């Protein structure tokens, strides 16, 4: 299993347009990707705070606002490439102008 971490750094967080871009990126690879919202300092991990990377609704339910760390788990032939692409997308603030 491939893993990676990223910090949501765009102003609006993981909103609908950003989630759609993440889904499009994830779907372009031969891999199954899970996104986990990590707790902030002092919070406990919510066992429900995970989503499949190809489900916009599930990603929106993570409520991942600016500053939230996410962990990505990937399985499949292109898992590492998929995670690298998603981490790059998040790092580019989902290609949004702020």
Feature-to-residue mapping (PLM):
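Compact, glycine-rich, soluble single-domain proteins
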Residues: 9-65
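Short amphipathic
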Residues: 1-9
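Generic anion/oxyanion-binding catalytic loop in active/binding sites
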Residues: 8, 48, 71, 75
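Residue-level signal for beta-strand positions within conserved beta-sheet cores that form or flank
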Residues: 2, 31, 68
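C-terminal structural segments of small proteins and small subunits
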Residues: 61, 65-98
């Amino acid at each position: 299993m491939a893993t990676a971490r990223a910090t949501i750094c765009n102003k609006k967080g993981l909103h609908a347009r950003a989630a759609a871009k993440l889904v499009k990126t994830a779907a372009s690879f031969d891999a199954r990707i899970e996104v986990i919202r990590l707790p902030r300092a002092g919070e406990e991990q919510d066992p429900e705070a995970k989503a499949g990377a190809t489900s916009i609704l599930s990603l929106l339910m993570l409520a991942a606002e600016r500053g939230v760390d996410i962990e990505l788990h990937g399985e499949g032939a292109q898992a590492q490439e998929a995670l690298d692409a998603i981490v790059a997308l998040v790092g580019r603030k989902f290609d949004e102008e702020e």
